[in-house]
Amino acid sequence: MFKNQYDTNTTTWSPTGRLFQVEYANEAVNNGSAAVGAKNKDFVVLTALKRSPVAQFSSYQEKVFKLDDHVGMAIAGLVADGRMLARFVRTECMNYRYMHDSDNPLPLIAEIVGEKYQRHIQFAGKRPFGVGLLIAGYDSTGPHLYHTVPSGDVFDFKATAMGLRSQAARTYLEKHFESFPDCGLDELIMHALKALAAATSGGAELNIKNTTIAIVGKGTPFMVLTEEAARKYLDGFKMRPEDIPPAPEAEEEETLQERSLDVEE
């Protein structure tokens, strides 16, 4: 039987128990430009590579969004879907603050986002969201980093990456994450940048124009660093050869600009 008999909507299972529409949405995330999240005992850091503009006079697509004073997110995949989910979470945070006069707890935000994803794959007539989120925030229980995917699954991480060539970034994080709880904020930012650089051929592409850095933590509301603040970390940024993970054998040799789905054309 041909696969296209089972991929016309999200409510049709294949004979092998697969939902092809959800798998296609996951591929949109995997082909988006990379994003990395890492946390220590007091802070969470997000770094994201913004898509190269299609023309010299066009701007970069934003990849990191502030959702509330205590939470924000980075995206990989279809930017329009990410913006819609950002508006949805902002509304949920405002409603919670109106009802309870306090910040929306991070586990509840992650659960609400997962349910939003799941509703789009449970009924015919809707398509899955083609975007993955890294949700970073700080509440009364400490720092949190969640990863959501088009299937509706929500994962709680100490550090992770998503997007194109993210396996190389995860390999770097796996080698260093045990030192994250006790490292300072500046060191944590550098680790996140090195992981992002590992997903971009050793960091040659990282600069203040195409790289976003965001932080949130104890006594620090969620903020996206300005170009001047980010310059401290990105000017002269270099990856040591020993920090560059070997590329997976099966990874295709296409460039980020060729495969990224972040720009709407």
UniProtKB/Swiss-Prot annotation:
GO terms for biological process: ubiquitin-dependent protein catabolic process. It comes from Trypanosoma cruzi. The proteasome is a multicatalytic proteinase complex which is characterized by its ability to cleave peptides with Arg, Phe, Tyr, Leu, and Glu adjacent to the leaving group at neutral or slightly basic pH. The proteasome has an ATP-dependent proteolytic activity. Its main location: cytoplasm. Residues 256-265 have a biased composition (Basic and acidic residues). InterPro entries: Ntn_hydrolases_N (IPR029055), Proteasome_alpha (IPR050115), Proteasome_alpha-type (IPR023332), Proteasome_alpha1 (IPR035144), Proteasome_asu_N (IPR000426), Proteasome_sua/b (IPR001353). Transmembrane segments: none annotated. This is Proteasome subunit alpha type-1.
